[in-house]
């Protein structure tokens, strides 16, 4: 594709030399070290470093031109031979150029975007599952992986950056996908990563405290999430949780004809449930929808999973799926790795062990409340908090575990570059003196100790890391999987 054709999509680019107007762009790179002959380098400003400052490395590697911010040009002025193009809006420039280069793949798929603090991963998996059951080829992009039939790749971000995102969408189109289901993070919306993606369905699950190390406050966090439902992104219907305060605000802000609300108990919502019966292996009841009512049996436990189920049902109903087909598929849903995932080494195991990704105050509370009815003995919670992240949620999480669990093991999560002991102290600040938690900084030892100390009938909840198979210590990522450590401890326990 010619450079002038790409830049025609961007109104904030200046100073394109005429000699380069017909230059052929072979690829787009945002990493200067990855550039090769014929590539276009887009240097994105970051929170710590402006990637545009590395344009000399990109040009030296063969890039035909570099698009960078005015600040990067000022800090590292180009010499005569280097073609450096300045853009006042790098976010929009990158997204627009990437979408154009890959042939606007988002327009060739029916896209579903799911945003919210909690529930994105389960909801997107449910939507993908229902579409697949209807024999509709679907691409899934989210926290765990990007996948479609015949392809799977571990994810590095909940929502890929613009160039990678457009490339993956194009690959999905080429693979024959008709639908794309995407977790859309607040970071992605604030940074414009999904510009150029017209969503047929936008889902809002909830908003609770998280990412306040990035967003200035909850209103800023909400404003980022709400972008998904602006005309720039949403072309079809919004599916919004009416049980959430921020969801109620969104419902009021949008045109009623564009919204389907959902609620587990409120019959005034467009989608709701009745006749709920909670059983050891899931929930049964009736789902009420604008397309009719249907009985269902779900293997998922917890009210929050009923909310996720309603959101997914609403999304695929709007996409044209048959309600009875959806209901027939629900009992077959296999679940999501690291989300209320049971760890079992034999069917006669005398304790239950559950691994879950809960890493916010709200999700941790939901996990503990959902697990309680299925644990006849004591509920033991092993948890920590991530380093270099919002410190204010740590004492809140400590308080929640102190109130809802019978025994608390406070340990490390991903401390990153922060002092692990300071993280533990922040958590302990929320635990009242009347509760005596066990504090073990080494997560592997904490898991082993909790499982070995458990008595028959107890349940051990390993919260915070879920599907993750790594731990970040300093700047190093080491292999660590809660499920592996749990199995090892369960095996040791059987030999006692």
UniProtKB/Swiss-Prot annotation:
It is found in: Cytoplasm. UDP-N-acetyl-alpha-D-muramoyl-L-alanyl-D-glutamate binds at residues 32, 158-159, 185, 191, 193. GO terms for biological process: cell division; cell wall organization; peptidoglycan biosynthetic process; regulation of cell shape. ATP binds at residues 116-122. The modification N6-carboxylysine is found at residue 225. InterPro entries: Mur-like_cat_sf, Mur_ligase_C, Mur_ligase_C_dom_sf, Mur_ligase_cen, Mur_ligase_N, MurE/MurF_N, UDP-N-AcMur-Glu-dNH2Pim_ligase. It is an enzyme of class 6 (ligase). GO terms for cellular component: cytoplasm. It catalyses: UDP-N-acetyl-alpha-D-muramoyl-L-alanyl-D-glutamate + meso-2,6-diaminopimelate + ATP = UDP-N-acetyl-alpha-D-muramoyl-L-alanyl-gamma-D-glutamyl-meso-2,6-diaminopimelate + ADP + phosphate + H(+). Meso-2,6-diaminopimelate binds at residues 389, 413-416, 464, 468. Its cofactor is Mg(2+). Keywords: ATP-binding, Cell cycle, Cell division, Cell shape, Cell wall biogenesis/degradation, Cytoplasm, Ligase, Magnesium, Nucleotide-binding, Peptidoglycan synthesis. A motif (Meso-diaminopimelate recognition motif) lies at residues 413-416. Carboxylation is probably crucial for Mg(2+) binding and, consequently, for the gamma-phosphate positioning of ATP. GO terms for molecular function: ATP binding; magnesium ion binding; UDP-N-acetylmuramoylalanyl-D-glutamate-2,6-diaminopimelate ligase activity. Its EC number is 6.3.2.13. Pathway: Cell wall biogenesis; peptidoglycan biosynthesis. Belongs to the MurCDEF family. MurE subfamily. Catalyzes the addition of meso-diaminopimelic acid to the nucleotide precursor UDP-N-acetylmuramoyl-L-alanyl-D-glutamate (UMAG) in the biosynthesis of bacterial cell-wall peptidoglycan. This is UDP-N-acetylmuramoyl-L-alanyl-D-glutamate--2,6-diaminopimelate ligase. The lineage of its organism: Bacteria, Bacillati, Cyanobacteriota, Cyanophyceae, Nostocales.
